[in-house]
Amino acid sequence: MSLSARISVTSLYRVEVSGWDKSQTFFVEKSELEWSEDSGKHVTLSSAVPDGSVVFLRLIQPLTADRSQSVPYETEFLSVTPDGQNQFRLHPVSPRIVDRGSVN
């Protein structure tokens, strides 16, 4: 009888996160994106970001002059770390379809 164990691999990426914090102040912060197939994408920020808000992540690529494109994510607040950092799970943002055929 063979038992196969599933190994979860977590990858870390340096990212630049930007958006608006709880006081509606725009911020840009460097952090690490933790990416796992099992638990999804997580980021820890010093900025207090409202739950459910949209932030933009840009991958920081060393050794290249090219800037990657920012990608929007919706935040899901998870917890505050012992040192006061805010932990979030990130969910992809899909474009919303607006019905412009309605006349008010």
Residue ranges and their predicted role:
Residues 1-104:
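Structured alpha-helical
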